[in-house]
Amino acid sequence: LVIVGGGPGGLAAAIYAGRAGLTPVIFLGIETSSQLMTTTEVENYPGFKTIQGPDLVQNQVDQAEHCGAQLFYEDVTKIDATARPFKITHGYENEIMTCDALIFATGSTAQRLDVIGEKQFWQKGVSACAVCDSMMAKNKDTVVVGGGDVACEEASYLSNIASKVYLILRRDAFRASAAMVQRVKSNPKIEIIYNSAVQEIKGETRVNQILVKNLKSGDITPLKVEALFWCIGHTPQTRLLKGQVKMSENGYILVENQTQYTNVPGIFAAGDCCDWIYRQAIVAAGSGCKAALDAERWLASNGGH
């Protein structure tokens, strides 16, 4: 059994598979790519009142190794899933490892706009997950950027926590459904700013101001806020299996109902690479557990290891 991905989905799979005696190999990458690695305080993971994202990942890595997983800090560069055993190409020397079962848990990446100040203030007032980092916005003036259903949903969610929410759209109309648009328009704590884009994020140790450019007039207006959330979409990291397993139009791996099975026997998916709805660490970990149990049973029935 090979697991590709070093986030909570892949690591939970490694823990369960290790405890089942499968001696799984898990590829964590040269640098662990879990979004938790760029998260400061995690306050919604059961068992921890608060924990730093990298510390949570390291705890899971240590537990996976303790349970018998073999850790490879290398990138997987190619997967040949056309026939069993599957071929996994990895590392600088393009070595090939074969396996009878594969759990793919490479996650997704939140899209950002790479404006001035974004990197400097990432997790210091700037985030791409309102549910994960809502405490950044507590009793603060907050910005949400985006015009789709997710942006409207997150603006509505944050309106219960922030003192005020500015919803910034590049266009003069929403892409969201009529019901979601009505929800934000009728919310007295949400102010909608049309035809605009964030030009720069400013602050000292944390965000305290952004510059907003009107895309029609070109005027730039300062806006005093202390939190900003990008809600402009996610990109699933599934290119290694593109054309080999069934995916959605947006590139998310499709799994069979109530399981982590893909349409290819012996290949399972877990975490955000197959979840475009919840995108939470605890959900990813749960799906990693399911994937390991599915893989264990599948291997037992198909004579693999």
Swiss-Prot record:
Ranges that cross the membrane: none
GO BP, sorted A to Z: removal of superoxide radicals
Keyword Flavoprotein: yes
UniProt-annotated binding residues for FAD: 28-35, 272-281
Cofactor detail note: Binds 1 FAD per subunit.
Membrane recorded as keyword: no
Protein EC: 1.8.1.9
Disulphide-bridged cysteine pairs: 129-132
Catalysed reaction equations from the record: [thioredoxin]-dithiol + NADP(+) = [thioredoxin]-disulfide + NADPH + H(+)
GO cellular component: cytoplasm
Subcellular location: Cytoplasm
Cross-referenced Pfam families: Pyr_redox_2
Enzyme class: oxidoreductase
Keywords: Cytoplasm, Disulfide bond, FAD, Flavoprotein, NADP, Oxidoreductase, Redox-active center
Cofactor(s) the protein needs: FAD
Gene3D superfamilies for this protein: FAD/NAD(P)-binding domain
GO molecular function, one term: thioredoxin-disulfide reductase (NADPH) activity
Further comment found in the protein's record: The active site is a redox-active disulfide bond.
Family per record: Belongs to the class-II pyridine nucleotide-disulfide oxidoreductase family.
Subunit structure: Homodimer.
Protein name per the record: Thioredoxin reductase
Taxonomic source organism: Spironucleus barkhanus
Gene designation: TRXB
